């Protein structure tokens, strides 16, 4: 599995079978999937969210998995396979909503790869769909918490695995944490200390014991497509262009924008 870190855009992450099975058990504790379900896999399976949530998890529960052909055919694939559970990123699910791309058999939507905007979450819930937004990253097998409430807070899959550091950083331990970055001890030791993963995200635990995200890792740009971009590395590449004195990337009107 690959992810982006503060200094690299394509960083290989080592996940074990135990990591993946722990994620499956965590999902099963909050979301129902049975042998009667049909799951449409429309996210690339080299992506941790797509691999675990749209392939391994449903297969473990005996559900039928249908492999989609990508975003270009997502509406046709949805009506062809008639899934009961749909897995997607915020941008993918929002696109399907906009084109009325949900089949009548659909009852559950799982959104991951990025935080689900409140507008989209509210709209889906108003359609009598069960909606779950997953919080996690590749380094934690994609299973830290799940949101199914309008307030945007996350129920933790394991209350003992998540804590808040003195500076507000969210840190994660336990069986969901990766083994490390592939063949890179130094990068691993920078974020994984005594088995505790430092996410770079910031948050708090509310009175109900739910996780509230306050800020995502400022060194990484997380797109609604679920893609991650190293802010530092991308800024360096822009500045290295001949004739560019200074450049950086920002979000402007919910769009990724380069300022040069």
Q: Which role fits each region the language model picked out?
A:
Residues 17-18, 43, 160, 195, ...:
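Structural detector for helix-capping/boundary residues
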Residues 174, 179-180, 202-260:
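AMP-binding/adenylate-forming catalytic core of the ANL superfamily
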Residues 1-25:
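Conserved AMP-binding A3 loop
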Residues 35-36, 105-106, 194:
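Phosphate-coordination loops involved in phosphoryl transfer and adenosine-cofactor binding
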Residues 130, 149, 155-156, 165-191, ...:
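Conserved ATP/PPi-binding loop(s) of AMP-dependent carboxylate-activating enzymes
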Residues 5, 113, 136, 174, ...:
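Active-site glycine-centered loops adjacent to acidic/histidine catalytic or metal-binding residues
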Residues 21-38, 45-85:
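Conserved AMP-binding/adenylation subdomain of ANL enzymes
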Residues 84-88, 96-150, 245:
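Gly/Ser/Thr-rich phosphate-binding loop
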């Amino acid at each position: 599995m690959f992810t982006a870190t503060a200094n690299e855009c394509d960083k290989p992450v080592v996940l074990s079978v135990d990591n993946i099975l722990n994620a499956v058990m965590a999902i099963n504790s909050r979301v129902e999937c049975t042998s009667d379900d049909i799951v449409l896999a429309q996210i690339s399976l080299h992506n941790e969210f797509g691999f675990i949530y749209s392939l391994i998890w449903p297969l473990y529960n005996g559900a039928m998995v249908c492999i989609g052909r990508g975003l270009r055919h997502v509406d046709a694939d949805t009506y062809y396979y008639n899934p009961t559970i749909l897995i997607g990123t915020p941008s993918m699910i929002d696109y399907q909503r906009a084109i009325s791309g949900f089949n009548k058999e659909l009852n559950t939507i799982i959104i991951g790869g990025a935080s689900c905007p409140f507008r989209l979450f509210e709209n889906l819930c108003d359609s009598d769909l069960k909606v779950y937004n997953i919080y996690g990253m590749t380094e934690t097998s994609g299973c830290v918490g799940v949101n199914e409430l309008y307030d945007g807070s996350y129920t933790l899959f394991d209350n003992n695995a998540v804590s808040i550091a003195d500076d507000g950083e969210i840190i994660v331990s336990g069986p969901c944490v990766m083994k490390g970055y592939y063949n890179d001890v130094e990068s691993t030791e920078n974020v994984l200390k005594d088995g505790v993963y430092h996410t770079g995200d910031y948050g708090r635990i509310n009175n109900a014991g739910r996780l509230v995200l306050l800020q995502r890792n400022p060194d990484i740009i997380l797109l609604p497509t679920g893609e991650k971009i190293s802010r530092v590395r991308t800024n360096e590449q822009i500045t290295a262009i001949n004739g560019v004195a200074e450049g950086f990337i920002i979000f402007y009107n919910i769009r990724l924008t380069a300022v040069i």
